[in-house]
A protein has these predicted regions:
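Extended intrinsically disordered, low-complexity coil regions enriched in Ser, Thr, Gly, Ala
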Residues: 2-10, 56-62, 106
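Intrinsic, low-complexity N-terminal interaction/targeting segments
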Residues: 20-38, 59, 91-96
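Vicinal oxygen chelate
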Residues: 37-63, 81-86
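A short, polar/charged loop-to-alpha-helix boundary motif
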Residues: 101-118
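Cysteine/selenocysteine-centered motifs that mediate thiol-based redox chemistry or coordinate metal-sulfur cofactors
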Residues: 120-150
Length: 150
């Protein structure tokens, strides 16, 4: 349960929350009789959870180890630190720290305006950029909705 509390159960759907706030819950739908998907489109690659810092991450890591799960060491992903483990059904879970955050290599007001990659992906920049769709963002559509830094 990763410190989540069961707050609702309807049929085969179970809703877990850490604090009851909107967006801070996970729904799990149990369908053990369906066929298992193959890796690719339409399947889950991994599920990521955020944690406050490396200290809370280490606590989660130790709990998972006590549950008998195989958990990775803490991995530095430059923008955050991650641990990974597979749940009994085979889905890869990630627990990532919020710090250091995505503003470590660009000013906050420019966040998201250009593609930033972790150092180990720079060698793949051309291939990554060529596979991305062109996004035509009309910034004027967002200024009236409280987005003042656009």
């Amino acid at each position: 349960q990763m410190d989540h509390q069961l707050i609702d159960e309807t049929g085969n759907r179970f809703r877990f929350s850490t604090d009851g706030k909107p967006g801070n819950f996970v729904d799990i739908v149990c369908t053990p009789d369906i066929l298992q998907g193959l890796p690719g489109c339409g399947t889950v690659h991994h599920v990521a959870f955020a944690t406050k810092n490396e200290q809370t991450q280490k606590i989660a890591q130790q709990k998972l180890i006590r549950f008998g799960l195989n958990v990775t060491p803490i991995l530095d992903r430059e923008y955050f630190h991650s641990i990974y483990f597979r749940e009994p059904g085979g889905i890869l879970f990630e627990i990532a720290t919020l710090p250091p955050g995505f503003a470590i290599d660009e000013p906050l007001e420019e966040l998201g305006m250009s593609l930033k990659l972790p150092s180990w992906e720079e060698k793949n920049r051309m291939a990554i950029e060529s596979a991305l769709p062109i996004i035509n963002l009309r910034l004027e559509n967002y200024k009236d909705h409280g987005h003042t830094n656009l």
